[in-house]
Regions:
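Short, positively charged and aromatic/hydrophobic N-terminal segments
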Residues: 3-5, 29, 35
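Intrinsically disordered, low-complexity polyampholyte segments enriched for Lys and acidic residues
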Residues: 13-14, 18, 36-38
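Non-catalytic C-terminal accessory region of glycerolipid acyltransferases
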Residues: 36, 41-43, 49-51, 56-59, ...
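Membrane-anchoring hydrophobic helices of lipid-metabolizing enzymes
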Residues: 36-176, 181, 208-213, 219
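Catalytic core of membrane glycerolipid acyltransferases/transacylases, capturing the structured
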Residues: 167-227, 249-261
Length: 354
């Protein structure tokens, strides 16, 4: 189940640099990526069905997914306090049985918080798995809970910054990170503004169909496959907002080593290049769950000024510093089970257990 949830969290995968962007050759080169010559093909899913009720999905191999989705719909209807309690218990269980991911998260915390004692990091690790379990319920709420169930739970701060950026008419890159609250945070934003979500299509056609269906239903705009440069630029020309989170490791291609928690970290550089190519404003936003059952706050910050600066490395480092600041506010709610430091500078040792 931990692997399922981890892969789910990667579903909103913004990594424009992992695979060559598809669209115009000139545009792809301006972003700094290769062009593969086929603007229509998304090879991750071959001809996924567009309807949820499809005879293919009655095959036994899809039954576990149907069961999981059914449980998530039930979870979304539970009282909020029950969700927090049950989610926390599930997360703690995942932390005990998901030994590999627990070791990865522990390695990440040791790298990023060397100033904390081993006991403090162990406590933070337990809190992280609690947040992961709650994140399952938050995902269910994001997809299936009615608005009236959620309105009293969320406070959006700084909505005027998003409105001002959209008023420019050149589109907005809604910049964030992979927090356990990411699906619910995006749902809260859509109350103010429809948005596209950059994501990597899922290999399983049933999960891909459900994921696209629910995100489009709530976001009011279709998700964009991460290699669809043409669709991305079209959205910006229409003055639309696009969800984007450049904080995961996908290798050296179109990446650079810049500091993140003081560690040279392989980081996608496409944010700066996309902003330069499209003229879109970059508006950071960060959702966070409040202590107890107090709900959520979504902090929308002013559009980044003097961005892009013309220095891609400086721009990328600026984004990492911004992410680090907000991760430190709620460190347990960041996705530490991802191997963020997998790609290392030449001569540097592997930081993760085998």
């Amino acid at each position: 189940m931990l692997t399922f949830y981890y892969r789910f969290m990667q579903g909103l995968d913004e990594q424009i640099g992992k695979r060559p962007l598809q669209g115009s050759r000139q545009g792809a080169r301006q972003v700094g990526l290769a062009y593969n010559g086929n603007p229509m093909k998304h090879p991750t899913v071959a001809n996924p069905p567009t309807r949820l009720w499809n005879w293919r999905f009655l095959a036994p191999r899809y039954w576990p997914i149907w069961l999981g989705l059914g449980l998530m719909k039930v979870m979304a209807a539970l009282p909020f306090r029950w969700q927090l309690t049950a989610g926390g218990q599930i997360g703690r269980l995942l932390g005990r049985i998901g030994r590999r991911r627990r070791k990865i998260a522990a390695a990440n915390l040791a790298l990023c918080f060397p100033e904390r004692s081993p006991a403090e990091r162990a406590e933070l690790l337990d809190q992280h798995f609690t947040a992961l379990g709650i994140g399952l319920f938050e995902t269910a709420m994001a997809w299936w809970a009615p608005d009236e169930q959620l309105h009293d739970l969320a406070e959006i701060k700084g909505a005027e910054h998003l409105e001002e950026a959209l008023a420019r008419g050149k589109g907005v890159i809604l910049l964030t990170g992979h927090f356990t609250t990411l699906e619910l945070g995006a749902r809260f934003i859509t109350w103010r503004q429809p948005l596209h979500a950059m994501y990597r299509p899922h290999k399983n056609p049933l999960y891909e169909t459900v994921m696209r269906r629910e995100r489009e239903r709530r976001s009011r705009l279709p998700p964009l496959p991460h290699d669809d440069l043409r669709g991305l630029l079209r959205a910006f020309r229409k003055g639309q907002a696009v969800w984007y989170a450049p904080d995961q490791n996908h290798g050296l291609r179109n990446s650079a080593f810049v500091p993140f928690f003081g560690i040279p970290t392989c980081t996608i550089t496409a944010t700066s290049r996309l902003a330069a190519l499209s003229g879109a404003a970059v508006v950071p936003y960060f959702p966070r769950r409040l202590p107890g059952a107090a709900g959520y706050v979504v902090d929308i910050l002013p559009a980044l000024d003097h961005f892009p600066s013309g220095d891609v490395l400086a721009d990328t480092q600026r984004i990492n510093a911004l992410l680090e600041t907000h991760i430190r506010q709620v460190p347990e709610q960041y996705l530490w089970v991802h191997r963020r430091f997998k790609t290392r500078p030449p001569g540097s040792p592997n930081v993760y257990p085998l």
